[in-house]
């Protein structure tokens, strides 16, 4: 049986409060749809931790700039429902709102063609939706993906805050593939006193090691093979650390050479402390190596945690 689908925020809030009145705990798995095994593993974890689970399916315009791939983001809602039906047992509902930004009334549409001083905007502002409030986690959002996608993390933090306020979950689950995002949500929850447990789940990978992503479907067969250079170079870096090679500049150069040698275009390679996301020069304790690279028109991210005590 396919899960119940809730389309508006008031009905979603009413459902959640009804569950709470019955003493049930609620899990939340935020997604943008086109579900793959990584998403489904989060749902399974949530079902193991809570009584009922809400899977949100909403492609968030607030985390895309007007030049990014909002319009081409893959979608298969009926397929998503079929996948969820196979594991829900009646304990999963889908929150699939049409729009979480338009609250009636519109702001003047922003067109950043030079008329607003080069201000960076998202598809929400560019579309003229009546929304002006954004959540920012100032320090953690500045590096990595925040450099090349300057509206991304404020859009993520804002939509997750909206979902927390609407669904009112006890637990929310996020994949560690989006490592910076996971740490940002953790910090936001701590700083704003949300009474929600944030669970990070290990990266789900294809059999050949490619990190699962909804965007993988847009890779050609050749691009997909070349994209394996990301996960393979990360594994090589981890093996090098185990052999005592701890200079971060050398490790980053090795990864860059592997990706570029496979015709990838590197956005960044960073080696940072797992907790603070501050860069390190020598690996002496727990770090994460984060990579973003383009293959064709598809931007992929991946990372690997390295836990050492040297």
Curated annotation (Swiss-Prot):
Pathway per the UniProt entry: Cofactor biosynthesis; (R)-pantothenate biosynthesis; (R)-pantothenate from (R)-pantoate and beta-alanine: step 1/1
Residues reported to bind ATP: 32-39, 175-178, 212-215
Major subcellular site: cytoplasm
GO function terms (MF aspect): ATP binding; pantoate-beta-alanine ligase activity; protein homodimerization activity
A Pfam family reported for this protein in Swiss-Prot or TrEMBL: Pantoate_ligase
Residues annotated to bind (R)-pantoate: 63, 181
Reaction catalysed by this enzyme: (R)-pantoate + beta-alanine + ATP = (R)-pantothenate + AMP + diphosphate + H(+)
Full protein name: Pantoate--beta-alanine ligase
Source organism (scientific name): Arabidopsis thaliana
Assembly: Homodimer.
Gene3D superfamilies: HUPs, Pantoate-beta-alanine ligase, C-terminal domain
């Amino acid at each position: 049986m396919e899960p119940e689908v809730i389309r508006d925020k008031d009905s979603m809030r009413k459902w959640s409060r009804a569950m709470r009145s019955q003493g049930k705990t609620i899990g939340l798995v935020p997604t943008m749809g086109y579900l793959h095994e990584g998403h489904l593993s989060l749902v399974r974890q949530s079902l193991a931790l809570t009584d009922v689970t809400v899977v949100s399916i909403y492609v968030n315009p607030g985390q895309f700039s007007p030049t990014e791939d909002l319009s081409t983001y893959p979608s298969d809602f009926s397929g998503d429902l079929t996948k969820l039906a196979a594991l829900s047992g009646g304990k999963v509902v889908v929150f699939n709102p049409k729009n979480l930004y338009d609250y009636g009334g519109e702001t003047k549409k922003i067109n950043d063609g030079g008329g607003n001083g080069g201000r960076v905007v998202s598809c929400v502002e560019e579309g003229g939706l009546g929304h002006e409030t954004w959540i920012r986690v100032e320090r953690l959002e500045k590096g990595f993906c925040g450099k090349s996608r300057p509206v991304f993390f404020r859009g993520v933090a804002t939509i997750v805050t909206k979902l927390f306020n609407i669904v009112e979950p006890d637990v929310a689950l996020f994949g560690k593939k989006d490592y910076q995002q996971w740490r940002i949500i953790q910090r936001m929850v701590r700083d704003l006193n949300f009474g929600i447990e944030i669970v990070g789940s290990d990266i789900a990978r294809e059999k050949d090691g490619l990190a699962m992503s909804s965007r993988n479907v847009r890779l050609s067969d050749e691009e997909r093979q070349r994209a394996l250079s990301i996960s393979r170079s990360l594994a090589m870096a981890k093996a090098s650390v185990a052999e005592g090679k701890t200079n971060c500049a050398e490790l980053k150069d090795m990864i860059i050479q592997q990706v570029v040698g496979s015709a990838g275009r590197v956005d960044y390679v960073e080696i940072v402390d797992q907790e603070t996301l501050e860069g390190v020069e020598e690996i002496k304790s727990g770090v994460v190596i984060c990579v973003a690279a383009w293959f064709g028109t598809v931007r992929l991210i991946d990372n690997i945690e390295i836990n050492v005590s040297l």
